[in-house]
C-alpha cells in the first residue's frame, strides 16, 4: 500500500533530478548510505514483549548490492522495515546519508523514506488499474502532472522490459511480469535505495534469474543501492556484493560474499552455505577432513593428484560442487 498525499518526495525535487538527467546515486563503495547502530525492535504481545531484533550494527555502502539472509523468523523482514521506518525501532538508530531518522521531523522522515523504494514478495498491485496506471500512482499522489507521470512511467516500464504490456491489467500478467511492474513502481520517485523483501520467493527459478538480472542492471546502470532480503543462498551468490547473516534477532556475521562462502565462521553460516554437508556426521576414525576451494573460473593444477603423490596417502572426495560467485 502506498502512503497518502505528501508521503512522496517533493515532485519539484524528483523532476529536477529527472530533467537534469542526474542519476539517483553514483556508486561509492567506501562510504555508507545507511548505518544501523545498536538497532533493536520489540513487539508487545499478550504474553509479554517479543524481541525481533537486538543490537544490530551494519553499514550499507553507496552503490552496492547488499544481502541480508536468515532462516524464517530470524528477523530479516523486521530489519528491512526498520530501515525505512515502516516499523519504528525500539532502540538504536538508523542513519541515512549521515542523518539520524529518529530525530527527524515528520516531513523530513517522509522524504527520507521516499528515497527508499520497496518491493515485496506479494506484488501489491492495484487490480483495477492497468500496468501504466499502477506505475503512475505514486507520482499522482505526489501531485505530479499526468503528462510527466505518464512519461516517467513509460520510461520505467521500458527499462523493466514491459513496454508492450502497459495497457494490461494485473490479472493478465505472469508472476514475473507483476514483479517487474512492482519494481518500476518502486523506482517512480527516483529512489536512492531499493529494498527487496523476499522479492523472488514466489517465483519459479527461471523467472527468479531474470528478476535478479534486472535488479543487477538497475544497480549497475543507475547506481541505486539495492538491499536484498532472502532466505535463499542462491539469491545472495547470484547478485550480492556483501552479505549479513541474521540469526535469532542478531547479526551472526558480515562480509564479502566470496569470503563468507569460502569460510563461514558462524554455525548458521555453515548451515546455510554448506547445507547437508555441514550436518553430516561422517566417521572416519582418525582421518582428517579437508575443504579445498578453487577461487577462479578454472583450476588447471591437479591439486588432488599432487596431494596424493606428496603426502603418500589415499584421498576420497566426499562432496564437490561449483558456484558462480562475483563472476568467479
Regions found by a protein language model. Give the residues of each.
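Non-catalytic connector elements of ABC transporters
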Residues: 2, 10, 14, 284-328
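ABC-family P-loop ATPase nucleotide-binding domain
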Residues: 2-42
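ABC family nucleotide-binding domain
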Residues: 30-219
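ABC ATPase "signature
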Residues: 254-255, 263
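A short, surface-exposed alpha-helical micro-motif characterized by mixed small hydrophobic
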Residues: 236-238
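C-terminal boundary and immediately downstream tail of ABC-type ATPase nucleotide-binding domains
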Residues: 261-293, 311
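Conserved H-loop
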Residues: 223-229
Amino acid at each position: 500500500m502506498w502512503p497518502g498525499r505528501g508521503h512522496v518526495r517533493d515532485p519539484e525535487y524528483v523532476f529536477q533530478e529527472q530533467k537534469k538527467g542526474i542519476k539517483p546515486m553514483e556508486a561509492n563503495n567506501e562510504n555508507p548510505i545507511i548505518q544501523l547502530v545498536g538497532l533493536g525492535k520489540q513487539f508487545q504481545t499478550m504474553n509479554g514483549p517479543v524481541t525481533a531484533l537486538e543490537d544490530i550494527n551494519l553499514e550499507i555502502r553507496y552503490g552496492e548490492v547488499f544481502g541480508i539472509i536468515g532462516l524464517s523468523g530470524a528477523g530479516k523482514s523486521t530489519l528491512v522495515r526498520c530501515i525505512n521506518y515502516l516499523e519504528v525501532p525500539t532502540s538504536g538508530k538508523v542513519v541515512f546519508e549521515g542523518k539520524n531518522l529518529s530525530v527527524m521531523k515528520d516531513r523530513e522522515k517522509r522524504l527520507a523514506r521516499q528515497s527508499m523504494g520497496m518491493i515485496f514478495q506479494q506484488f501489491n498491485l492495484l487490480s483495477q488499474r492497468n500496468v501504466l496506471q499502477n506505475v503512475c500512482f505514486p507520482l499522482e499522489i505526489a501531485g505530479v502532472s499526468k503528462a510527466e507521470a505518464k512519461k516517467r512511467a513509460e520510461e520505467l516500464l521500458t527499462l523493466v522490459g514491459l513496454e508492450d504490456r502497459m495497457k494490461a491489467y494485473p490479472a493478465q500478467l505472469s508472476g514475473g511480469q507483476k514483479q517487474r511492474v512492482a519494481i518500476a513502481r518502486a523506482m517512480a520517485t527516483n529512489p536512492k535505495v531499493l529494498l527487496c523483501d523476499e522479492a523472488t520467493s514466489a517465483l519459479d527459478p527461471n523467472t527468479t534469474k531474470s528478476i535478479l538480472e534486472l535488479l543487477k542492471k538497475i544497480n549497475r546502470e543507475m547506481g541505486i543501492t539495492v538491499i536484498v532480503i532472502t532466505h535463499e543462498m542462491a539469491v545472495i551468490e547470484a547478485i550480492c556484493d556483501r552479505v549479513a547473516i541474521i540469526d535469532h534477532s542478531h547479526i551472526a556475521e558480515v562480509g564479502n560474499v566470496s569470503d563468507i562462502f569460502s569460510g563461514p565462521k558462524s554455525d548458521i553460516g555453515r548451515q546455510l552455505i554448506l547445507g547437508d554437508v555441514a550436518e553430516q556426521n561422517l566417521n572416519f576414525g582418525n582421518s582428517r577432513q579437508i575443504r579445498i576451494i578453487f577461487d577462479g573460473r578454472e583450476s588447471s593444477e591437479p591439486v588432488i593428484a599432487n596431494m596424493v603423490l606428496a603426502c603418500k596417502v589415499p584421498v576420497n572426495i566426499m562432496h564437490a560442487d561449483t558456484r558462480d560467485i562475483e563472476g568467479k
